[in-house]
């Protein structure tokens, strides 16, 4: 889990030798042994909070639109005080390939949102832009009403943390499960090693893993690695008096898993958020989460509201129960898996 704080600047938790592009230069982070790590971007872990069960009488969104803004407007909600993240008319290209073409939407407090659509339509790209790993070529990203320019380290925005769980678990191969889950606490907190070790054990138990603390990632199955990454997203410094709310972004959390393992991960995502408390039973910080997925089971089990990305635009949005009954031809084809329709490969 890569958890990025909007409140200050330090290093991100990235796999060894992974490069990311800033707005003006390319930076490279190489992760050596734990004691030698240099932080440039603040990375933080915390408990993620429950989604909101939205109304069953939500307005249907069956017409094609150029942007994704407006779900709450359609429902008559004019107050934006509960908006945590907003993307306004976001564009992004890589070379000659235009990935995002004017994407707009809002993530509100307490929501569980799914981003779906065919491969190559910009789902992971918009996730990285929201997390601050990529800067949009055009358009704006607002964090709790404050405009963020460029990458997350370009300016300080307090009041919200944004976590990103990569499609791969992004665990450090040379570190044990205990060291992976408690990584930031060992490096950045004032907690003792015994305190961290106990908290890691409790957090792993909360995601259904016991007795794996001393194992290496290579000794775990794919599903277990996903759960370790989830545990890393839930753990936080319990000695702090104030913990800011967090929005957690999942990039295909069930990719590569069998149906049963997928169900375990989906239910963990939902149940951990629904408890409204952290791994050790203390009150949690209610926020929101967003899941990028291709899996129908994830759509049905883990999210309440859907955004459909196609050719770089949000062409449909609605509630989960509307997905299979939509008259939108693009959504119909995606829902049924038919080869006949607008989506071509």
From Swiss-Prot:
Transmembrane segments: none annotated. Keywords: ATP-binding, Chloroplast, Lipid transport, Nucleotide-binding, Plastid, Transit peptide, Transport. One of its GO terms (cellular component) is chloroplast stroma. It holds the Pfam family ABC_tran. GO terms for molecular function: ATP binding; ATP hydrolysis activity. Residues 85-336 form the ABC transporter domain. Disruption phenotype: Disruption in the biosynthesis of ER-derived thylakoid lipids, and accumulation of oligogalactolipids, triacylglycerols (TAGs), and phosphatidates (PAs). Accumulates Gal(beta 1,6)betaGalDG, an unusual form of digalactosyldiacylglycerol. Growth retardation, early bolting and no viable seeds produced. It comes from the Eukaryota. PROSITE patterns: ABC_TRANSPORTER_1, ABC_TRANSPORTER_2. One of its GO terms (biological process) is lipid transport. Residues 1-46 form a transit peptide. It is found in: Plastid, Chloroplast stroma. InterPro entries: AAA+_ATPase (IPR003593), ABC_transporter-like_ATP-bd (IPR003439), ABC_transporter-like_CS (IPR017871), P-loop_NTPase (IPR027417). ATP binds at residues 117-124. The keyword Electron transport does not apply. Belongs to the ABC transporter superfamily. ABCI family. Catalytic subunit of the TGD complex, a lipid translocator at the inner chloroplast envelope membrane made of TGD1, TGD2 and TGD3. Interacts with TGD1 and TGD2 with an overall subunit stoichiometry of 2 TGD1, 2 TGD3 and 8 to 12 TGD2. Interacts with TGD5. ATPase transporter involved in lipid transfer from the endoplasmic reticulum (ER) to plastids, and necessary for thylakoids formation. Not involved in transition metal transport pathways. This is Protein TRIGALACTOSYLDIACYLGLYCEROL 3, chloroplastic.
């Amino acid at each position: 889990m890569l958890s990025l704080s909007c409140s200050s600047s330090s290093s991100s938790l990235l796999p060894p030798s992974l490069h990311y592009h800033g707005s003006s230069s390319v930076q490279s982070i190489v992760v050596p042994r734990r004691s030698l790590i240099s932080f440039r971007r603040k990375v933080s872990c915390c408990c993620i909070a429950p989604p909101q069960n939205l109304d069953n009488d939500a307005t249907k969104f069956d017409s094609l639109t150029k942007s994704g803004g407006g779900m709450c407007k359609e429902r008559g909600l004019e107050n934006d005080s509960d908006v945590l993240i907003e993307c306004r008319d976001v564009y992004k290209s890589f070379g000659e390939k235009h990935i995002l073409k004017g994407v707009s939407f809002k993530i509100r407090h307490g929501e569980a949102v799914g981003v779906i659509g065919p491969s190559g339509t910009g789902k992971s790209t918009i996730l990285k832009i929201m997390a601050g790993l990529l800067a949009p070529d055009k358009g704006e990203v607002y964090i709790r009403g404050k405009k963020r320019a460029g990458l997350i380290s370009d300016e300080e925005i307090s009041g919200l943390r944004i976590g990103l769980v990569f499609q791969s678990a992004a665990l450090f191969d040379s570190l044990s499960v205990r060291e992976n889950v408690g990584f930031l606490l060992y490096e950045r907190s004032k907690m003792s090693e015994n305190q961290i070790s106990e908290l890691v054990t409790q957090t792993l138990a909360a995601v259904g893993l016991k007795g794996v603390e001393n194992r290496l990632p290579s000794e775990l199955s794919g599903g277990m690695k996903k759960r370790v990454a989830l545990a890393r997203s839930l753990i936080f410094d319990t000695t702090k008096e104030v913990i800011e709310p967090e929005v957690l972004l999942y990039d295909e959390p069930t990719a590569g898993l069998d149906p049963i393992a997928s169900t375990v991960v989906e239910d963990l995502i939902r149940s951990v958020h629904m408890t409204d408390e952290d791994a050790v039973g203390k009150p949690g910080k209610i926020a929101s989460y967003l899941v990028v997925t291709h899996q129908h089971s994830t759509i049905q089990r883990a999210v309440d509201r859907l955004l459909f990305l196609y050719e770089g635009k949000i062409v449909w949005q609605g509630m989960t129960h509307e997905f299979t009954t939509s008259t939108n031809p693009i959504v119909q084809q995606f829902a049924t898996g038919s080869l006949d329709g607008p989506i071509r490969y």
